[in-house]
Amino acid sequence: KIRVTNITRSAFSGLARAENVATLPWETIRSLQCSTLGESCGMLRFEPELEKFAQSEPGWMRQLAQVIPAGSRVFLGNSLPIREMNLALQTTKPGVEFFANRGANGIDGLVSTFLGTSASHRGECWLIVGDLSTLYDLAAPWIIAQMDHPKLRIVVINNGGGKIFSRVNSLRALPEPARAVIENRHSLSFEPWAQMWGLEYVQTDDVHDLVDLLPVPIVIEIKPDPMQTETFWRDWQKPVIRPR
């Protein structure tokens, strides 16, 4: 088999096999030449940007990764959550496991799948999912009352629609009404959803509210700052100026 050297911010190599794979710590990348790194060099350059734009979507992913405790099981939603966590994650705490799932239509059934993966884990279980993915699976929490699991944390990143489509170049030139339809824009709150299933609820713009949560299932609604998000991605797309 082909030998692979993997430089990662976590212990996960991203490969299905362990043979002929050397996994090196993320810090190794600092000793390499930027000219050979491409996007990875840009990731290092944007660590300060993630901190500066802490209320942006990628900034929130970085903050969430910092407060999720060791030994947790984390389920990442499709579309932007998994991409932004992959970008923003600096390191993982001991024993943190990551899961993801691709529904038949992409984002369907994610809350249900999260609850299924949580059933066998007695530590904290975190779902980080987009608003449209949540709307596709509103009935999922019916099973929570039968699970006897006090540490379920459902984080809904509510950016008012499918914002991944706003980053598709071919769609940017469309008329505004067409873009609104494609993005499925809305102004919904997920508090009534939490109330319907008897779950605790908090909407926050301060990650410190998520430290030492009560041992009860809870819906956490986060509304990222759209201007910070747009500025972050605009800076991200700027070319990396490499030293000669």
Give each language-model segment a name:
Residues 89-244:
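Thiamine diphosphate
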Residues 39-122:
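Active-site diphosphate/adenylate-binding microenvironment
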Residues 1, 6-10, 53-54, 76-80, ...:
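Structural motif
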Residues 27, 31-33, 69-72, 83-88, ...:
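Redox- and metal-dependent alpha/beta enzyme cores, enriched for Fe-S-associated oxidoreductases
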Residues 3-5, 73-75, 126, 153-154:
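A structural signal for isolated positions on well-ordered beta-strands in alpha/beta enzyme cores
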